[in-house]
Every structure is written in C-alpha cells, then in structure tokens.
Amino acid sequence: MVKIEVAKAINFNELINSKEAEVVSMRILNEANSYISLFSLAKNEEITAEAMLGNRYYYCFNGNGEISVENNKKPIKTGDFLEVLANNNYSVKSLDTLKLIEIGEKIGDETMENQTLKMLESASAFSLADCVEYKEGQIVSKNLVAKANLVITVMSFWKGESLDPHKAPGDALVTVLDGEGKYIVDGKAFIVKKGESAVLPANIPHAVEAETQNFKMMLTLVK
C-alpha cells in the first residue's frame, strides 16, 4: 500500500516535521513483508530501546544524531546509511532535528540470501553517495541489500545514460543523492533533484534518464 502521491518529486523535509519535544513518524509504503517509514525527531529527543524481528536500515536526510545498537553508539548525519540487525536492542537520539528514512523487514528470514557491501558489515554509518563512483558513459549499480522481499541499490548515471522502460514487481522508492534524474512513469516525465524522492508504482512501466547531468540515486524495492 502506497500512502503518498506516486510518480512525482517529493521533498520529505516538507512532508514530515517535528515541533519541540515531538517525535513524528509516517509510514509511506507498506507491503506484506517490508515497509518504508519516515521519522522526524526534534532536538534531543529519543526513540527508546527496542529489538525487531527483521533488519532495519536507516538513511538520514536531515540533521545528525546517534543510533545506539546494544549500547554501542553510532553517529549518523545527513547522507549517511546504517544497518541495524534483527534482534538487536537499539535506540535513536537526535542531536538536532533528525529526519530518517526507515526501511524495515517485518519478519527476518535467515534462510534468505542477503548480498551486502562490506560497508554494511562494519556496523557503522557511511556516506551513501560515496558507495558508487561515476564512470564515463556508464551506469554503475551496487546492491546494499538483495533479498526476495527487499532490495536496496545505489546507482550512478553518467550524463546521457538511461534505463529503458521496464516494470518492477513491487513499489519502489527512489531518493536522489547527487545531481538530478529524469523519470518517466507510464509515459509521463518528471524531474527528481538531490534531496528529493519519488515512488515508482509496481507493475507500471517506468524509465530513468540522466538527461542534463550525472546523478546518483538510492532505489528501494519493497514487496
């Protein structure tokens, strides 16, 4: 289930905000096995310790804070990505207004193959845009997570490169990490700039193009 408008650029900083002493959450994609939510924590607020049955992945799109995993504090700031493994107690604290994309598995499945970057294995936050480099005349992609019901991929496009129209079996969230990209959904084009996101609905043809400049994006497919 998609809970925000699809096939258009959205600035999550405008979509979710927290006033003093508030923690605000919003689930934007909700599927049988995985989901995507937004969080906004006012300065010096905290989500208290809890443990989940599936892995959690966090992308910070505003501010900075700390995510403590089994009492091990991990700093996170704008542009950073961090994995929290299932069944680990963790909490989130904001040092200023902190906004996060939370990507979650509802139930972990240890039998599913999960291909991850070595950076995820370090259990520390890292700059997502730095995962892939630009290569002249090429499209570069790296999977951070590759499971049957959840895929998180970081991609770079050289100016002029494109992906032909195709369909995905699940709803996808794209977040532009650098530059700007042109997206065409069911024949209708729109631009998504750095810091903006868009939902590409399942089973509807869409294409991607680096029309005016190089760009990078995070693609999250949930099923």
Task: For the regions a language model picked out, list residue spans one by one.
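Short strand-coil-strand connectors
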Residues: 32, 68-72, 95, 184-188, ...
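A cytosolic small-molecule/anion-sensing beta-strand core signal
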Residues: 61-62, 77-78, 96, 177-178, ...
